[in-house]
């Protein structure tokens, strides 16, 4: 934190893991400008976490006072999956992942699947930002890579507040029937956890969480990217949601030599794209 912008660890309640469960606590780092003015809001969503992770989740700095930002962790991942020693000091206990393999958690249970909760976590995070006096909710943006790209699509599709623009990079969770024919993960996890479901039933279940379908609800401007050598979230799975977007204000960048990674020029590209659409 600085005099320009204060950084807070925020804890908020999100939907239960199942309809009859208890609310789930999720967390993020919130950066609030201190000048008393309203600022554009940028939501940041993380990629797929690691089990027993020890890396420190990114935290915003206090010097960039142009934006109100939320670096948000969905249930069981990142901030919600770190020991106290692997976070910036906050005086709280270890936070533990109770879900095991996130993609497999309650697989096949539409109202209890992991990504149902995760998508709603992101919706709740936007609702939190709307409560802050410094948030200009008429200028709302989201960005993320891999899983974070999928979450950017999901929140733009499902949020109570319309997004101005989003920036999904090498996005996850796209066009499952083709996705599972192209690469082994998460197809192997899905097939190992589908129980008695036929493939047709499995894909019908996954259709609720497919960015290709979520994209049909999105009117925000979109800047996207894909690596043509990506063996985790291949180009086709990125193009499928992009093609289904309602918006005509969209652009996708292809990086011929890039795998599953973030381009070195990506942050500059997306911030220029966002700034061009700010009021």
What spans do the regions from the language model cover?
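N-terminal cap/lid segment of alpha/beta-hydrolase-fold proteins
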Residues: 1-36
């Amino acid at each position: 934190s600085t005099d320009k912008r204060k950084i807070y660890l925020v804890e908020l309640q999100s939907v239960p893991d199942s309809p009859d469960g208890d609310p789930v606590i999720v967390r993020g780092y919130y950066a609030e400008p201190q000048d008393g003015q309203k600022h554009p809001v940028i939501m940041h969503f993380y990629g797929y976490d690691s089990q027993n992770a020890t890396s420190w989740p990114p935290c915003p700095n206090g010097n960039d006072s142009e934006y109100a930002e939320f670096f948000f962790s969905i249930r069981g991942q990142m901030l919600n999956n770190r020991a106290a020693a692997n976070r910036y000091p906050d005086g709280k206990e270890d936070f533990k992942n109770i879900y095991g393999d996130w993609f497999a958690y309650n697989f096949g249970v539409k109202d209890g699947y992991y990504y149902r909760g995760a998508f709603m976590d992101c919706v709740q995070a936007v609702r939190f930002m709307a409560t802050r006096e410094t948030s200009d909710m008429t200028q709302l943006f989201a960005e993320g890579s891999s899983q974070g790209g999928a979450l950017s699509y999901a929140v733009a599709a499902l949020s109570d507040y319309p997004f101005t623009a989003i920036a999904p990079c090498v996005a996850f969770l796209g066009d499952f029937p083709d996705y599972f024919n192209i690469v082994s993960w998460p197809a192997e996890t899905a097939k190992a956890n589908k129980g008695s479901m036929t493939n047709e039933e499995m894909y019908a279940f996954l259709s609720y969480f497919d960015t290709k379908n979520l994209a049909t609800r999105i009117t925000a401007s979109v800047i996207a990217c894909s690596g043509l050598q990506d063996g985790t979230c291949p180009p086709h799975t990125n193009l499928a949601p992009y093609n289904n977007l309602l918006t005509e204000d969209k652009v996708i960048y292809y990086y011929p030599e890039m795998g599953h990674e973030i381009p070195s020029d990506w942050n500059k590209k997306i911030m220029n794209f966002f700034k061009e659409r700010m009021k």
